[in-house]
From Swiss-Prot:
It comes from Paracoccus denitrificans (strain Pd 1222). Catalyzes the ATP-dependent amination of UTP to CTP with either L-glutamine or ammonia as the source of nitrogen. Regulates intracellular CTP levels through interactions with the four ribonucleotide triphosphates. This is CTP synthase. Residues 291-546 form the Glutamine amidotransferase type-1 domain. L-glutamine binds at G352, L380, G381, M382, Q383, E403, R474. Allosterically activated by GTP, when glutamine is the substrate; GTP has no effect on the reaction when ammonia is the substrate. The allosteric effector GTP functions by stabilizing the protein conformation that binds the tetrahedral intermediate(s) formed during glutamine hydrolysis. Inhibited by the product CTP, via allosteric rather than competitive inhibition. It holds the Pfam family CTP_synth_N. Pathway: Pyrimidine metabolism; CTP biosynthesis via de novo pathway; CTP from UDP: step 2/2. GO terms for cellular component: cytosol. Homotetramer. ATP binds at S14, L15, G16, K17, G18, L19, D71. The lineage of its organism: Bacteria, Pseudomonadati, Pseudomonadota, Alphaproteobacteria, Rhodobacterales. Mg(2+) binds at D71, E139. It catalyses: UTP + L-glutamine + ATP + H2O = CTP + L-glutamate + ADP + phosphate + 2 H(+); L-glutamine + H2O = L-glutamate + NH4(+); UTP + NH4(+) + ATP = CTP + ADP + phosphate + 2 H(+). The gene is pyrG.
Length: 547
């Protein structure tokens, strides 16, 4: 049965609980343990699938089609363990499950209350798969004291109480603010955060203290005394140049040892951190630099493209080169022109929804095609590349997407991209209507693409004729225009196994121009970069040498 580590936060949000959880999972793996990481989000949305990227950041999609928090991306990148639907839950999902059970009569006429019905639902979620791994790391979103988070804190308190003391521990992440006027770190916010946590029945075993300045030993001792933890369980967490330094930094600070001590695991297996030392070597000793323009709709918030940013870093590691990614607002291209892309060694157009900014994406695809600049179009980025080719090469000047017509409420375009109403998933066929609810109704999760032998995409994947990547879309390039587009030079080099859905397009006469309907960035890891991103950066390096 798994040991449980509950990671909570206090003082302020966005302190890095997700990264701390991912780094701790990686450190436990380095000691030979198996791990799984989970995220419990107190917001009332059922999942983040319908939330604005400006509100929530990226939606991370799992192999089995769950739309989850971007922290699950950190979990996967650091541990290599593929997340599942059962690794992410929100208050909305919990309450939805409880109400569905009430309607079915599952509670036998009882009055439904937060305790025990909601807390029991949360505990049932925590217990799924507990026999599969050595450690289950569960991050609670938000901060202690948030009203919407109280049922989760109560549930983990009960969960720990119902198990042996040596089976559950609590790690609490707090902030030590620096007061410039007095030139000192202040521990009082941490003390009050722990006081708040203890008031709901949870006593932290390990404190992780975020700080911009070194934490003196006397301050660590003071925190330990007032918060009732061991001095060596007060772990400093400083700002780092790269998130991939976190496992090594937390190991030096003693986080993994403090956790094992709290579980009374002795002697603790020695860690093998070779993998992370190699990652840092590739980052710190990179030679040269390539400049990449990411032309998107949500560039004001980099977290909206978190996996893109990390996959570019991984591609740089694979080629031992630094990647400088600039976030270019696609609407700005519409107003100021594609000359804004001059000087870049590669262009990425990532996914998105809605018509806003898409003419700028189309302009970026045209610029890359005509200037022979490496281009990677992802999801919407592939669709915009197809529309650009249809308009300017295949004699369809009014080519566009049904998505834009549906948004405007009138027909304006020849729909080379159409609303996907049916597709094969496993052994059955999924059917969708335009009037369906938005949440959870897209083509989600891992799907196979069958590749054309000898195509560039096949070469990138070492000659593979089938690849599998994750998807998140409800619009698709219409295969009925395939012959017309291929005659214009745009090759359909990857299709769904039934031959109905285009998965990959590429230009035969271009050094490197590929569009994919999937999201290969979601499976990229620092020690296993996504082949498409490694190949894209390699092509950008070739372009840099030509400039």
């Amino acid at each position: 049965m798994a040991r449980y580590i509950f990671i909570t936060g206090g003082v302020v949000s966005s302190l890095g609980k997700g990264l701390a959880s991912a780094a701790l999972g990686a450190l436990l793996q380095a000691r030979g343990f198996t791990v799984r990481l989970r995220k419990l989000d107190p917001y009332l949305n059922v999942d983040p699938g319908t939330m604005s990227p400006f509100e929530h950041g990226e939606v991370f999609v799992t192999d089995d089609g769950a739309e989850t928090d971007l922290d699950l991306g950190h979990y996967e990148r650091f541990t290599g363990v593929s997340a599942r639907k059962t690794d992410s839950v929100s208050s909305g999902r919990i309450y939805s499950n409880v109400l569905e059970k009430e309607r079915r009569g599952a509670y036998l006429g009882k009055t439904i209350q937060v305790i025990p019905h909601v807390t029991n639902e949360i505990k049932d979620f925590l217990a799924v798969g507990e026999d599969e791994v050595d450690f289950m790391l569960c991050e609670i979103g938000g901060t202690v004291g948030d009203i919407e988070g109280l049922p989760f804190f109560e549930a983990i308190r009960q969960f720990a109480q119902e198990r042996a003391r040596s089976q559950c521990i609590f790690v609490h992440l707090t902030l030590l603010p620096w007061l410039a006027a007095s030139g000192e770190l202040k521990t009082k916010p941490t003390q009050h955060s722990v006081k708040e946590l203890r008031s709901i029945g949870i006593a932290p075993d390990v404190l992780v203290c975020r700080s911009e300045h070194p934490i003196p030993e006397k301050e660590r001792a003071k925190i330990a005394l007032f918060c009732n933890v061991r001095p060596d369980a007060v772990i400093p967490a400083y700002d780092l140049k790269t998130i991939y330094e976190a496992p090594l930094a937390y190991h030096r600070a003693g986080l993994d040892q403090a956790v094992l001590d709290a579980f009374q695991i002795s002697p603790a297996p020695r860690p093998d951190l070779t993998r992370w030392e190699d990652v840092m070597d590739r980052l710190e000793n990179a030679e040269g630099q390539v400049r990449i323009a990411v032309v998107g709709k949500y560039t004001q918030l980099e977290d909206a493209y978190k996996s893109i940013a990390e996959a570019l870093t991984h591609g740089g590691m694979a080629n031992r080169v630094r990647v400088r990614a600039d976030w270019v607002d696609s609407e700005k291209l519409e107003g100021e022109g594609a000359h804004l892309l001059d000087g870049y060694n590669g262009i990425i157009v990532p996914g998105g929804f809605g018509e806003r900014g898409t003419e700028g994406m189309i302009a970026a695809a045209k610029y890359a095609r005509e200037k022979k600049v490496p281009y990677l179009g992802i999801c919407l980025g592939m669709q915009m590349a197809v529309i650009e080719g249809a308009r300017n090469l295949a004699g369809m000047p009014d080519a566009g997407s049904e998505e834009f017509d549906h948004e405007a409420g009138k027909t304006r375009f020849t729909p080379v991209v159409y609303h996907l109403k049916e597709w094969v998933q496993g052994n059955y066929t999924v059917q969708r209507k335009l009037t369906d609810d938005k949440g959870g109704t897209m083509r989600l999760g891992a799907y196979t693409a069958v590749l054309v032998p000898g195509s560039k995409i096949s070469e990138i994947y070492d000659g593979a004729l089938e690849i599998e990547d994750r998807h998140r879309h409800r619009y698709e390039v219409d295969a009925k225009y395939r012959d017309q587009l291929e005659a214009a030079g745009l090759s359909f080099s990857g299709m769904s196994p039934d031959g109905r859905l285009p998965e990959v397009v590429e230009y035969r006469d271009h050094p490197w121009f590929i569009g994919v309907q999937s999201h290969p960035e979601l499976k990229s890891k620092p020690f296993q970069p996504a082949p498409l991103f490694a190949g894209f950066i390699r092509a950008a390096m070739d372009n840099e040498r030509l400039v």
